[in-house]
């Protein structure tokens, strides 16, 4: 079952993954979740965090920087260096 739960994380949109991650954080912060369940939802939270990071990296790779010449005229685009 745990493998299925983690597998479905790989299909979530960024918005859905972040929403679920926020829900998990809130539940853990409330401190009313039994230990075993806390561990399980923490592990899912880690998977959701990795999914969000992966989707953000993909989005960054698609962003392009607009280039201009000395007079400010647009000359094209190049990959954005986000380091």
Swiss-Prot record:
Gene Ontology biological-process entries: DNA catabolic process
SUPFAM superfamilies assigned: XseB-like
Subcellular location: Cytoplasm
Cellular component terms (Gene Ontology): cytosol; exodeoxyribonuclease VII complex
Molecular functions (GO terms): exodeoxyribonuclease VII activity
Subunit (UniProt): Heterooligomer composed of large and small subunits.
PANTHER family recorded: EXODEOXYRIBONUCLEASE 7 SMALL SUBUNIT (PTHR34137:SF1)
Family, as annotated: Belongs to the XseB family.
Protein name in the entry: Exodeoxyribonuclease 7 small subunit
Species this chain originates from: Nitrobacter hamburgensis (strain DSM 10229 / NCIMB 13809 / X14)
């Amino acid at each position: 079952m745990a493998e299925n739960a983690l597998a479905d994380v790989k299909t979530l949109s960024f918005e859905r993954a972040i929403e679920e991650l926020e829900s998990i954080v809130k539940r853990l912060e409330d401190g009313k979740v039994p230990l075993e369940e806390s561990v399980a939802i923490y592990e899912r939270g880690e998977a959701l965090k990795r999914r969000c990071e992966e989707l953000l990296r993909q989005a960054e790779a698609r962003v392009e920087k607009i280039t201009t010449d000395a007079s400010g005229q647009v000359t094209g685009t190049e990959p954005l260096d986000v380091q």
